[in-house]
Amino acid sequence: MPSSPPPDGGNANKTSIKPVSLSLGSSKKLPIKKPVSSHTLARRPHHNLPYHHDSDSDDNGGDSEPAFQSVTGFDTLTGRTLDASGAEEKKPLTIPVASGNNWRDRPGVIRRSKGKNLLPKEVQALQEAQSKGEVPGDGDAVGPSMQYGLSFAKQPQNDGGDQKMEDAALPAVEAAEKAKPLTEDEIALQALVRESRGEVEGRSDLVIESTRAGEGEAEEDVNEFYDGHNSETRSFRADVAARPESATLEQYNTIPVEEFGAALLRGMGWKEGQAVGKGKYGSADPSRASTPHIPARRPGFLGIGAKDVSNGKAEVELGAWGKAAMRKGSKKAGEATKNGEGNTEGIYMPVLMRNKKTGEMITEEELAAMAKEAKKRDDSEDWKEERDRNSERSERDKDHHRDRDRDRDSRRLEYDDTYRYESRRNGSSRRDRSRSTSDRHSRRRKYEGDDGDRRDDRYYRDRDRERRSDPVRDRDRNRDRKSRYYDDDRNSSWYSSSTASSKQRNRDRDRDRDNDRDSRRRK
């Protein structure tokens, strides 16, 4: 007995439960929809499947069958489906960056030990897949197998019977054959055999076993091996050996030029829709991660490193330069001021300079004014120095004239002294001659009587008195002459001083000669 036809698709969608009808014929069974419980998990949407077509809509009443897909398994780490046909969906081109291409990982570089990664293996594998650009779509990833919350250990089920014990397999002990040391006869015999075969070089039987880092060995031990004494050559060879192989021409041809940059960024962890720059790929803030970095425009007429003190008001047009652009900007600024708007386009902003000694900030105009004042000050200082030099020159001229007059006076005095000395010496010679004559007369009158003797005694007394007074006068005269000569020698030139000294020596020599002659006569 056929059942009544079901209601329309639209009404069926509105109702939660359809009426059940039975049929005894071979008619096709209609699917029965069960009410959705809030305790059950939502099904994975079909649009995540690779063979699902978005063109399929629900206009057919929801009776359209999904696309056929044969799945052989699931990846427990990344949550990807393994297709039986082996066909893979087209993935965006990605150029992975070699993780070993880091200078910190090179031999000879001191590396710090990394902390232990406490994340589950599933999360670590998911992060590694994301770094390689193999992240599945939304909803495809399977969560980690770790259970959160309160968990109980599973109790073994024991029915109370005897448990079957299996015999443990005994490890196979292999007898290691120990190599016996060769005797001297055997060594000599092997040497003869090698010589007969033409093998001149002998072979050593020694074996040095190398220890390799096992899987359970700590990473610090491996780092200690690399952190040993490594020369530059060893480090260079290790770096060259760690380099990947060069790409072939076919590999270059398979990568389109317009997709190379995006593929390289994907290999570095970049995703579609993210902003490029400033390293904000993994930012937790989505707005910050998707906001592109726009470089700030440099204010007008400012060089590299200069700071803008106008708060961004010194903007000029591209290509504007010179006084014409400044006048144009000033006109615009005047019009804007009249209209009530603060347009300062094209206004020249002076570059401030800092004085290293005082720390004062000055402009170019102030620096030029300071340089002009410094020049005037230098000119005035030069005039003062010139005046001082002129005064010193005049003083030197006066001293020169004074010395010349003094030399002339000294020469005149020397001439007078020489004249007096010569006249005195001539007078003394005449006196000596007269004395010698009187001596002869006295000797002649010696025999003449007592009157002659008295006259001779008076003459001798007068002569002795004169002699006693002459040395005192000579000493005073010599002292005055020496002091005068000393002053002349100190203030006069070298020639005048040498001349005076020579004359003085001559006078002293003459005086000594006269004294010697007088002394001889006195005897």
From Swiss-Prot:
UniProt entry tagged with the keyword Nucleus: yes
Residue ranges crossing the lipid bilayer per the database entry: none
Gene Ontology molecular function, alphabetical: nucleic acid binding
Function (record text): Involved in spliceosome maturation and the first step of pre-mRNA splicing.
Biased composition (Low complexity): 492-502
Stretches the record annotates as Disordered: 1-165, 200-230, 275-300, 323-347, 359-523
Subunit note: Associated with the spliceosome.
Biased composition range(s): Basic residues: 41-50
Main subcellular location of this protein, as a coarse class: nucleus
Record protein name field: Pre-mRNA-splicing factor spp2
Listed GO biological process terms: mRNA splicing, via spliceosome
Family: Belongs to the SPP2 family.
Composition skew (Basic and acidic residues), residue ranges: 372-440, 447-491, 505-523
Domain G-patch: 257-309
Biased composition annotated in UniProt, kind: Polar residues: 12-26, 67-79
UniProt keyword terms in alphabetical order: mRNA processing, mRNA splicing, Nucleus, Spliceosome
